[in-house]
Amino acid sequence: MVNVDILTPDTLFNLYNGTLEFHEFCKSVLGMRPGLRKDIRFYLLFGEQHKYYDGSPDGLPADSCTRLKYLQDDQPLDGGVDFGNMLSFVIGQQRGNTYRVLKNIYEIPPGWFRELADRFLRFFAPHSCKELNLYYDRAGNNFARQGEDYARKIKDAIEKDADGVRTGWTVCLMSRRQSNIPQAEEYGFMQELMKEGGKKLPRLLVDAVNCKELVSSIEKAPAGIRYSGTEKIVFKVKKSEKL
């Protein structure tokens, strides 16, 4: 039982409206696991201004791409895959100067590439423009040199179903022959991407309903600091990404 079960509505209202800080209200009253303080996050500038909640009807998770309000049906999709002890797959599109992350798909063991691809294929089956520009963790290129071409495997799993029949999708691997991005550079880039006003990069918006795992990962990724001589280097502590 959490405190919300035993407190009166008036007490809850007062606690929410100023008696407690929001993170303390979530932890003490609702029994929610608290997030990180903003000042120790790797994605320091990510906030409510980067989220939207009207991406699907009634604020409920979409069960098909036809329920995504901001999906451009006649345009290709961008996808980003992270290869780790779980597979994470986010899908987005850019319209004008706004980039929207529309959907988050993931797969945990024993599921793997086939299962992840099947989730994507089911959800985006009605999408008219069956082109996917796939970006991935550059470490995927390292796997390829070791004879485990993860990027090629997910491409093949999307372009052909479990019976080897072509699905109609064309996947373009966008990260071939690209080296890993140092975390210090990623930190600087994300600061630039997420800051408001007067920037050349597009405005970032994430569907907080259909990408809740991504939002959680961003908000719970802590930053660490190490030194190379007198140079301070910010890096991402990846314990929040483990199962």
Regions found by a protein language model. Give the residues of each.
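ATPase catalytic-site recognition across NTP-hydrolyzing enzymes
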Residues: 2-79
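A short acidic Gly-Thr/Ser loop motif
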Residues: 80-86
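Solvent-exposed strand-loop boundary residues in beta-sheet-rich modules
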Residues: 95-97
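Mg2+-dependent endonuclease catalytic cores in nucleic-acid-processing enzymes, primarily RNase H-like
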Residues: 99-238
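Short beta-strand scaffold segments in enzyme catalytic cores
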Residues: 87-93
